[in-house]
Amino acid sequence: VPDSNTSLAPAPAPHADLAWGRTWPSLEVFTELALEHRRVIPVVRRVLADAETPVGVYRKLAKDAPGTFLLESAEHGGVWSRYSIVGARSAATLTEREGQTHWIGEPPVGLPTEGDPTEAVRDTVAALATPRIPGLPPLTGGLVGAITYDAVRRWEKVPDGGRDELDLPEVAMMLATDLAVFDHSDGSLLLVANAVNHDATDEHIEDAWADAVSRLDRMADELAAPAPSTVATIDPVPNEPTSSHTRPEFEEMVEAAKEAIRAGEAFQIVVSQRFTVPCPADALDVYRALRVSNPSPYMYLLRIPHPDGTAYDIVGSSPEALIKVTGRQAITHPIAGSRPRGKSPDHDAHLAEELLGDAKERAEHLMLVDLARNDLQRICRAGTVDTVDFMSIRRYSHIMHIESTVVGDLRDGQSAYDALVATFPAGTLSGAPKPRAMALIDGYEGLRRGLYGGVVGYLDFAGDLDMAIAIRTALIKDGRAHVQAGAGIVADSVPHLEYEETVNKAAAALRAVAAAAGLRLLGDRPT
């Protein structure tokens, strides 16, 4: 999610110089920007919202409507990052129907309306490309959403993934136009209404500015409206998940993967299972429960329209980015190896030392660092790919990981989209080498993975990108929550331990569903 930097230094102008309640840019400045042939211009207004919360603002602005989202980030140790992003409205959603590009809503003129939906993502960002306005937050508009694991077949020669039990579009990217950006450093809330040049002409400039201002006014009115109390207690409702694979079936997958590794077909293979539970709760309440219990670097709630006229929700707390592009720099953070957090500081330190001393964990992590370097070398300038942080311990609320940081500078002609394609999917979700590992996974699992192992995040109008790996995530659709988790299999893996690892990885999201089902507003009585 935007800006994992916890620095509280004031942002540069024009953001920091905005007077409270003032609309920027003025019509005069807006006209100057429009005549520079910008396809998108953010019109903004800064208000004080130190008594509000991101969840409360999302509730007021989104009103459970499709095309809305909430993005947040908690750093190591649970410290919340500077910005929280509320998506209040999307002009349209770029998705896929029967394998082809499909728009829900009215996209601007000149955007692709047929063909490969992943290429449509690339071409939409290119068509709406607009230089960043200095001083505004890192995300003020763009394509926000999810790309499933199964989209990899559009970029790699991988066999068909078997049955599709979720009916999930491979691409679902919302064209986010109206946002509210929390700046936790000063308690301000920046309301953003993007004026999109829908017809690619210089006409109707004043009308476009007036429309954006009216949308700011509407958001301000919605924020000012009284809201019912959401103070609650939680009495979790136990759920017994069903799985895509029985325990013996999963352990047979592990043995098959080990046999393939011994035969030299792969170094590592990530096999997974999908857990499903009823989900009577609202997705926002699932997010609230997950936010409290498992804060992570990538927290997200997205309500996405489906081509069939319904909507589905994605609720997650992913610890891991696939790729982030800022300016011309691409950054990835391979994560492999884990231990639970200790019961005391000394115990925690002991577990960290044990993790770093585990030869199997170190070997797996080194393999993934090499894979990340190879991926970046496909799209970065020679000599710029570097491992700037190697095998550091990163601590989260319930778990610690070994994490490294690999960076590189994009070559001329390469975009953030190209960086996404080069690194997709994460080696931590496939294994290595990727193409053969993915082919084996398809044979073992027998199902399309859907969201699991894909990405959730954004490509903005200025050409930047931030994509989290879709793990520790619940897909809520048709009254059920689906949570998938995997284990990286190597030659000496123990089947029953790998099964238990998947159960443990799925636990946080499943607990959040149970907690949300048992959320009771103060004063309510269970029926």
Task: For each feature predicted by the language model, list its residue ranges.
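Extended alpha-helical targeting/anchoring segments
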Residues: 2-527
